[in-house]
Amino acid sequence: QRLSARGTLFGLGQAGVPDSLGPQDRDRIERWLETAENLPLLEDYVLAETETDREITIGATTLRCRMDAVFQRLDGSGWLIVDWKTGRRQVPVDQLSVYVHAWAASQGVPTGSVRAAYVYVDYPGGRVNELTAEGLLSIEQIQAALTVG
């Protein structure tokens, strides 16, 4: 296990890595964890929750979200949801809008205080695709997408 400068503990056990995993796979996961703990994105944040579930009802549909990691700003002023990606296939970042709305509702905070990003740990140094304020889908937009799809 390692303790980063930001106080976030990352270790193979916490990542759910079984003891039976081979050395090559363990090395790859260690690289991913090292990438994660050195991300500039996480500066000024501390890990609050991992593999946490939230639900949000939009229209007649209840969506269940499992968030890989949620970090809180050190000063308590905001949140950062991270969805770790171990592959390189890019996922549309606007899908994180559901996570932002679900987390904000569960904490009783405005969506403007919640950031969200996909972090692709298989790239050297990591690749971050963050949902921007302009890219955040409204509840109405999500509801419209649910009724179309």
Q: Which residues fall in each region the model found?
A:
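A non-catalytic, helix-rich entry segment at domain boundaries
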Residues: 1-56
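Short acidic (Asp/Glu) and glycine-rich catalytic loops that position anionic groups and cofactors
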Residues: 6-15, 78-80, 119-127
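Non-catalytic protein-protein interaction segments used by genome-maintenance enzymes to assemble
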Residues: 53-98, 104-106
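Metal-dependent nuclease catalytic regions and adjoining charged, substrate-binding loops involved
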Residues: 50-52, 103-149
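Generic alpha-helical hydrophobic packing signal
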Residues: 1-3, 63, 79, 115-117
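Alpha-helical scaffold elements adjacent to nucleotide-binding pockets in ATP/GTP-utilizing enzyme cores
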Residues: 2, 95-99, 141, 145
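Generic detection of long, well-ordered alpha-helical segments
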Residues: 18-29, 93, 136-143
